[in-house]
Amino acid sequence: MDIAMRAVEITSIGGFDKVTWDGASDTYPSKCIMYQLSHKEALTIVHEAHLRGLVTYFSAGFKFNEIRHGVFAGVDGIGIGGAQVLRYMDSQSGMHGPYMEENIPRILANRDEAAKSARGRGVQLLARLDTMYFEGSLSREEDVLRQKLFAALLAAEETEIEDLLLRLARVAALPSEGVTPHLHRAKRLVEAERPMMKEFCSAEQWEGLLRTLRSLIVARDEANIVEEYDSDPWLSLREKYRMSQCPRDSRICYVRQASFTLQIKA
């Protein structure tokens, strides 16, 4: 668990956007990471990563009956066992044969069944709430409900989860981001009534930022929204908001401000 959390810390400090936990070991075929983490641990590390704006992935070896555990952890993506689910493997020699695309509908059915349950819908909502907490578009009242939802999911309290799904219906109804995450991030800020980030600037500064974002949202200009995201006043405003989230006694506050791309030569 400490190693898994350190991965979140390193990824945040490095300014990266995605963290992956790999469950591969020295066995073949490999076992998925859910054999190394309890449900509570898996949910917690994904939750902590989402609070820092990271995309999450569990790599290696998920089989049919394990897919639901990935769904209930709230992880953004999982690695399906290619040698066990999507490809024929000779049990004696270990040699791989052709891909078995006929298994894809079964994979999706297992995922969808878990996603439609109370816990599945609850953890999807938690992922969105955690992301909105990171970007500062939640209200204080919604943030209290976010914390209650996390506790209910840890305890698998389905009645409480259903109640919170109703109370947070506004957030649950927000559209998926698709291929324009910054456009939707800007829309959530513009449409929020009492976003927490607003507390860290003057009314004039806030209105100035919203005017800029509204024009870019209308134009659906993802590229220029990214530029605004990495520039002032949005950048410095996020810095103030992020620093407010750090415990007062913490020696290091690891938060990521920018969405820069690292140029790496092949």
Residue ranges of predicted features:
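Alpha-helix-loop-beta-strand connector modules within alpha/beta enzyme cores
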Residues: 34-58, 99-114
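Amphipathic, non-membrane alpha-helical rod segments
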Residues: 128-168, 191-251, 256
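Glycine-rich beta-to-alpha transition loops that act as phosphate-gripper elements at the mouths
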Residues: 1, 56-65
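Generic structural signal for hydrophobic
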Residues: 10-11, 49, 70, 107
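Conserved anion-binding
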Residues: 1-33, 52
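Extended, intrinsically disordered, low-complexity segments
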Residues: 96-140, 158-191, 195-198, 260
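Glycine-rich phosphate-binding active-site loops on the catalytic face of alpha/beta enzymes
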Residues: 20-28, 73-101
